[in-house]
């Protein structure tokens, strides 16, 4: 079969790109993923479904490429977890849904590409999320990825003690770390609700995988891309 678009990798970017492209019913899309795909949420392995998997659970999993990196010539090699499953690294990471500071994006824009300014990116931040805690101009309410923060009465004792020590030292509290004016201590925004990890597979592909113009082919390792000039053939 001939496809209009072939997307390699169903991770943080690929799952989104394929899902968005398939919104055009006149185009056919093939999404290739080296790792497995789990169309049925009920059969999703616990290490991917729930947000508690860490350490050995992830490091030794078949859903992780298990890359090794060496930060310096004399340092011991270290594991660099990267997802090998639909959802990519969003299926195995720490689920911290924290934006950068506006000044950082504006600095990028000042280097030549004005599309990277905070004001230009904000609509996409909002489109990405359904923030269950905030619904102001800086947060989305209809996006595919659900975001929440643990309320203070849900914090474990050590977290409460840390908060008390920080406040007693004179640092301010902030309700929302993703507010552009935020400073001080704040609960971390997470793409995890009720213990469920909202990866791009769950957030994006669950909405698009039944479209007739989108084919998801898992366990498919791409060896190379053949180009003619600047065109992939």
Enumerate the predicted regions with their spans.
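N-terminal redox-cofactor-binding region of secreted/periplasmic oxidoreductases
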Residues: 1-233
